[in-house]
A protein has these predicted regions:
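Long, highly charged, low-complexity intrinsically disordered interaction regions
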Residues: 105-127
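A mid-sequence, solvent-exposed acidic-amphipathic segment
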Residues: 119-145
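Conserved short S/T/G-enriched processing/targeting/catalytic segments and their helical context
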Residues: 3-111, 135-170, 180-194, 199-240
Length: 240
C-alpha cells in the first residue's frame, strides 16, 4: 500500500500549549484524537524520548509516531558523526530533521506538522517552536494545533514570565474545557474522569515531571468554575 496510503486518514493532534513561566517551562495538551470519519480516541501527546528534552507535536498521529522514530533513528545513526545530537545543538539539528521529514512525508499531507520543544536546564531552560519550514524560534509562549486561536484567546496575553506554571495550567485547562464544550468541531477534549497531559520542567529540579495530582485537581476546579461564570454571563446577556 505504501507509506502515504497508511497516512491517509489517521487521527489529528489538536492543541498543545507551552509557556516559559517564572518557575519553569510547562507543556499542556488535550488528549482527544479525532479521525476524519468522526471517531476519536484519547492518549498522551507529550513525549520525552531523550533526556532533558520534551516534545509536543501537531499533525497526524501516525506522522507523529513516525517522526519520533525518525528522530531516535537519527540519534543512533549519527552518534559517531560530527552532526550527532548533543544537548547544546539539539534544537538546530532537530530543526534540520523536521525540514527533511516535512519534505519526505508531510508535503503529501493536508495537515501541517509543527513541533514544540522544551530543553530542561534549570533557570536556562528553553522553549522553541519549529515550524513547517524547519525554522526554530525561541518563544515565551506558543499554542499549536486546531485549537490554537482559542488557546491564544485564553492564554496568549498572560504575563508569562511573571506567572507560575500552575496558574498557566489553570488557564490552559479552562481553554481545553471551553473548546470541548463550545467548539466540538476543533476536536479538543479530555475524558470526563481524566485531566490534560501536563509536564513541568522546573527551574529548581533536574528532571521534568508530570504535574502532581493535587495540582491537576486544583486546576480542574478553577476551569470548571470559570466555565460556570461564563455560562452565567451568557445567560444574563440572553435575558437582557
Amino acid at each position: 500500500m505504501g507509506l502515504y496510503y497508511c497516512l491517509r486518514e489517521p487521527p489529528i493532534l489538536t492543541v498543545i500549549m507551552g509557556a516559559k513561566c517564572v518557575d519553569g517551562i510547562v507543556l499542556v495538551t488535550d488528549k482527544k484524537m479525532t479521525a476524519e470519519d468522526g471517531t476519536f480516541t484519547y492518549c498522551d501527546k507529550i513525549f520525552g524520548d531523550l533526556s532533558h528534552i520534551i516534545m509536543g507535536y501537531t499533525g497526524w498521529e501516525r506522522t507523529f509516531d513516525i517522526f519520533r522514530k525518525y528522530i531516535v533513528g537519527d540519534l543512533v545513526i549519527n552518534r559517531d558523526s560530527k552532526d550527532r545530537y548533543t544537548f547544546s545543538n539539539y534544537i538546530p539539528v532537530a530543526s534540520k530533521s523536521v525540514k527533511r521529514f516535512d519534505k519526505l512525508v508531510v508535503d503529501k499531507c493536508k495537515h501541517k506538522f509543527e513541533v514544540l520543544i522544551a530543553k530542561h536546564q534549570y533557570e536556562k531552560s528553553e522553549l522553541h517552536y519549529i515550524n513547517v519550514d524547519g525554522t526554530a524560534i525561541p518563544i515565551p509562549y506558543k499554542a499549536i494545533g486546531s485549537g490554537q486561536n482559542t488557546a491564544d484567546m485564553h492564554c496568549g496575553k498572560l504575563d508569562h514570565k511573571n506567572i507560575t506554571m500552575k496558574y498557566f495550567v489553570k488557564r490552559a485547562y479552562y481553554s481545553i474545557l471551553y473548546m470541548d464544550k463550545f467548539y466540538p468541531d476543533l476536536g479538543v477534549g479530555i475524558e470526563d474522569d481524566d485531566h490534560p497531559c501536563i509536564r513541568y520542567l522546573e527551574n529548581d529540579k533536574d528532571l521534568d515531571r508530570e504535574a502532581p495530582k493535587d495540582d491537576k485537581i486544583e486546576c480542574r476546579e478553577y476551569a470548571i468554575n470559570k466555565l460556570k461564570e461564563w455560562n452565567e454571563k451568557e445567560s444574563d446577556f440572553l435575558k437582557d
